[in-house]
């Protein structure tokens, strides 16, 4: 890595592929399991759901995949924190003055995170997901990145491409939604704290 330039958030270029690791809503789901377990039970989730969700907290480091993306030639990368993967994608597009075309159906989501999203009624796209890393990768670097991630045992998905048309367009089963604001209107974890009472309150 000596002499290699750091990979910034703003380097995505038209034609790059957008890759993400692990899944959406990781940390937010784990936090809800730790801090709102009684609410989770009341909403119909089971003990095994809560225990499984807590284990997601073990995945919050992105160092292994960040090393791989950096070594293999990614043009940009961004960890998914407050505001979820939607805010991450919007920031990457805005900073690079490009657009992103994303397929929601290609985004991995742990089954337990999906169960929590349904029970707590939150949008997994806007839920904090530390442990998830998003990167833009040129076509000619793609196979090397994928091979290295596979060898490291890191779950990944190719979720879309960088375009010259500005804005983030996400394809859902119901159609395509275009997002143009830099920041989504709300953070889902913060909304959960206003809607539900934590266990120690």
What are these regions (language model features)?
Residues 152-201:
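Acidic, Ser/Thr/Pro-rich beta/coil linker or hinge segments at domain junctions
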Residues 80-81, 99-108, 126-128, 146-173:
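Beta-strand->loop->alpha-helix junctions that form or flank phosphate-binding loops
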Residues 3-11, 21, 66, 90, ...:
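A generic local secondary-structure boundary/capping motif
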Residues 136-143:
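Helix N-cap motif at beta-to-alpha junctions
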Residues 1-39, 161, 173:
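Glycine-rich anion-binding loops of enzyme active sites
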Residues 53-129:
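Active-site-proximal betaalpha loop/short-helix elements
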Residues 9-13, 43-45, 67-71, 94, ...:
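Solvent-exposed alpha-helices and their adjacent loops that cap or buttress functional pockets
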């Amino acid at each position: 890595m000596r002499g290699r330039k750091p990979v910034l958030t703003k380097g995505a270029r038209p034609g790059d592929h957008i890759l993400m690791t692990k899944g959406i809503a990781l940390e937010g789901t784990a936090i809800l399991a730790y801090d709102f377990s009684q609410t989770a039970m009341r909403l119909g989730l089971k003990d095994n759901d809560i225990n499984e969700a807590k284990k997601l907290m073990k995945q919050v480091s992105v160092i292994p995949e960040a090393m791989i993306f950096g070594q293999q030639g990614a043009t940009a990368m961004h960890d998914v924190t407050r505001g979820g993967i939607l805010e991450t994608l919007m920031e990457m597009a805005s900073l690079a003055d490009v657009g992103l075309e994303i397929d929601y159906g290609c985004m991995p989501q742990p089954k337990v995170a999906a169960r929590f999203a349904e029970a707590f009624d939150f949008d997994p796209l806007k839920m904090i997901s530390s442990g998830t890393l998003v990167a833009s990768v040129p076509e000619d670097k793609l196979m090397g990145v994928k091979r290295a991630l596979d060898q490291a045992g890191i779950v990944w998905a190719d979720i879309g491409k960088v375009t010259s048309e500005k804005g983030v367009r996400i394809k859902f089963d119901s159609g395509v939604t275009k997002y143009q604001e830099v920041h989504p209107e709300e953070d889902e974890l913060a909304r959960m704290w206003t809607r539900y009472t934590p266990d120690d309150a």
